[in-house]
Amino acid sequence: MRVGILISGFGSNMIKLIESCEKENTRASINIVISNNPNAKGLEYAKSKGIRVHSIDHKLFKDRKNFDEAVNEILTNNNIDFICNAGFMRIHGEDFVKNWFNKHLNIHPALLPSFKGLNTHQRAIDQGVKFSGCTVHMVRSGVDEGPIISQAVTSVDSDDNAKLLSARILNLEHRLYPLCLQLFAEDLVSIAQDKVIYTEKALEVLREFKI
């Protein structure tokens, strides 16, 4: 499975996805990294790994549709099968989402459907929730919406601040996202009518992750 990653910055989740695809016996390969930010540091890392990179400055396009079309053209020309957002700070238009329907993952640093959007950690603390975490989900046209593939959970402690909570959740992201990508690469999960279908092997892998 040929994978493209979309980033806007450093792309720490991108790094973990690349590392997971460098292991033996994986059916996924990272074949291109695209950023809407020409100065994204993640581009240099991907390039150092021999991965093709592209920067497409969204500010040079008159609207979202034209930008999406440019991204889609690059993905298509590189025979990409599947996309992962890794800190990609742009909202996709409906046409782009349809083109990559059920072939496009995102990770969000909260337990969806709670705390969609930005500033998730401080909002979770302010609301007094006792648990937070991260969510891997299929991309849909709504912000941080789509079928949930898996979630990882951590406690929100009484002395937490946004920085401390963010660090713990980022550690979970770095483990969960590569795992979910590999589940799709190995055909262990699928989507039917917006419901996630798990094989017994997928359930076993996810249970082991949560232990």
Language-model region placement:
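N-terminal Rossmann-like dinucleotide-binding module
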Residues: M1-K41, Y45
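Short, well-structured alpha-helical segments in soluble
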Residues: E69-N78
